[in-house]
């Protein structure tokens, strides 16, 4: 399928000359760099706690502040999570990799350099399949590399015209996931970020908190233009530090149109302009990208091996062991839930929102007679409680097997759906089993036809006027009589069987 899109010169540049109104074709080219904070207990190269929030500059030490004489020590947990991320994204894990210093001067980078990996990254040659709601086809996106690096501090620009720096984030462990330029629309770029977040949160290497910057995306955008038999490319712009899917989608959409407009207004870029990569920021208020600076060349960063850190040497056995911990990924689990358990696409998508939720559901489904009934109950009732209490499902005062028992009682028609809701509330409050509550309160649904028929006859005997009304054509009496039978059974009678027996008895009058 072709990724070329069509446009006309006047629609882009506002031209009025009809000679410029010929159609042209263009292809959007996007590659993403995703920075992901890892869920380690400590920072990457020191023993400071790796937590968000807290008092500014309360979790720092000589190592993350870059004080003279302080030596970094790489965290094994950091490397382990990096390897697991690489395995989940289909990468080859390099048994040898090395750390480098990337030099640049920002106020929030106290060492004057960032510890990263330059030409010897931990992971290479991966790929993920991206499929969004608004994407017509699935796209395979190649991952060029994943490397380890540390985060910088945070600059806070206050209303008093001063800038303040919080170094708590200095040294927080990151991986940078670099894709090949395989994305062909802003929608695909947003879906790629979403897919990466879904996979990495599912295997629990990151919490993926977008608001706190645990996952940030830089998008490299340019356009290939075919016009009157000639091919042109616009210079690459890198849009930095986007922390939401909408931001990625909106920024890339705008940048593509901006580059097309610039091309028609100024003509093809010179060789010098093509070599200069522009760094852009996204202004969500104005809805525009803004030039921040012209990108440094690699030479400007003065990469060098970090003499304070030894090279990383991994064994095949170590990598093999970690591969077992990755487990089944969300896409595969969704497909299995739909194929084997008959779940809808929506149910499968929601229930694979986290590994904890997927595991919890699967335990309940295996213990129950009807996996779809269990899935629907979790989606409608269980998650409502989880969200209301702002807890994870593991903190719920119920086991998966307890929900399975409750659903089987509905499946076997021992209780109604309405009764199940009341019993569920009692289970949450007391921790009691569904069967114990049903037995103690005499809630078991009455399904025996002879017993229900006896109730019907009793109601008929008590309400002869209703029977005469029925004989005179008042058909709504049937519903009223059903209600009386249900009332006499204290709601325990099976509604469908009550309806059948009432209509049978009325037809014999």
Curated annotation (Swiss-Prot):
The keyword Iron does not apply. It is an enzyme of class 6 (ligase). Gene3D superfamilies: 1.10.10.410, GatB domain, N-terminal subdomain. PROSITE patterns: GATB (PS01234). InterPro entries: Asn/Gln-tRNA_amidoTrfase_suB/E, Asn/Gln-tRNA_Trfase_suB/E_cat, Asn/Gln_amidotransferase, Asn/Gln_tRNA_amidoTrase-B-like, GatB, GatB_C_1, GatB_Yqey_C_2, Gln-tRNA_amidoTrfase_suB_CS. GO terms for biological process: glutaminyl-tRNAGln biosynthesis via transamidation; translation. It catalyses: L-glutamyl-tRNA(Gln) + L-glutamine + ATP + H2O = L-glutaminyl-tRNA(Gln) + L-glutamate + ADP + phosphate + H(+); L-aspartyl-tRNA(Asn) + L-glutamine + ATP + H2O = L-asparaginyl-tRNA(Asn) + L-glutamate + ADP + phosphate + 2 H(+). Its EC number is 6.3.5.-. It comes from the Bacteria. Keywords: ATP-binding, Ligase, Nucleotide-binding, Protein biosynthesis. It holds the Pfam family GatB_Yqey. One of its GO terms (molecular function) is asparaginyl-tRNA synthase (glutamine-hydrolyzing) activity. Heterotrimer of A, B and C subunits. Belongs to the GatB/GatE family. GatB subfamily. Allows the formation of correctly charged Asn-tRNA(Asn) or Gln-tRNA(Gln) through the transamidation of misacylated Asp-tRNA(Asn) or Glu-tRNA(Gln) in organisms which lack either or both of asparaginyl-tRNA or glutaminyl-tRNA synthetases. The reaction takes place in the presence of glutamine and ATP through an activated phospho-Asp-tRNA(Asn) or phospho-Glu-tRNA(Gln). HAMAP family: GatB. NCBIfam families: gatB, PRK05477.1-2, PRK05477.1-4. This is Aspartyl/glutamyl-tRNA(Asn/Gln) amidotransferase subunit B. It comes from Treponema pallidum (strain Nichols). The gene is gatB.
